[in-house]
Amino acid sequence: MKGLLPLILLGGLMMLVVGALYYQPVTAQASPSATQPLQAEVEPTVAIAATWAGGGNNSTIDLGSLPADNMERSWPGGSSGEEVHTYSNVYIDLYVRASGDLQNGSNSIPLDNLKYADYDASVSKTAFDTVYALVKKDWGIPSQSGSLTVPVDLYLTVPFATLPGLYTTTIYHAAVQANATAPTTP
């Protein structure tokens, strides 16, 4: 065993030398700042609003009290009439339709008597339909946090002998990304 002692000491000494050569202390340095990349992908967004006389989104279009005189009356689009606004971050195509005839119980005013025009696209006076009609193609992108607005002129003829009462229908504006398939709902 005495003969092995020098070998054991030599082996231990070699292990210390080899360990010292490969020893790399781990040190952490405190820093006054830390940097991390952050990313967020913004999706294509189609967003519109329709307003009447400066009211809120989807405000009721109130044409007031009208005589049953078979005369066409008009309401110019703009801040005191109908407007559509886009907040989209892509080019859009804008469509319009109505739910059907203006109804008051079993009485009605034909939908052909309700018309629209303009949309800042020289849209000629056109009777509403129950299927979507394209009224503005490739409507641009507003500046960030802004909107673009177009006026919508409205026209209504109340036929002779239309019974008194409140007649209603629903106007739908819908938008899709430019050159996409036309909407079918709502």
Which residue stretches match the model-derived regions?
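N-terminal Sec-pathway targeting helices
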Residues: 1-10
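Signature of Gram-negative chaperone-usher
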Residues: 5-6, 22-186
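Hydrophobic alpha-helical membrane-insertion segments, chiefly the h-region
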Residues: 14-23
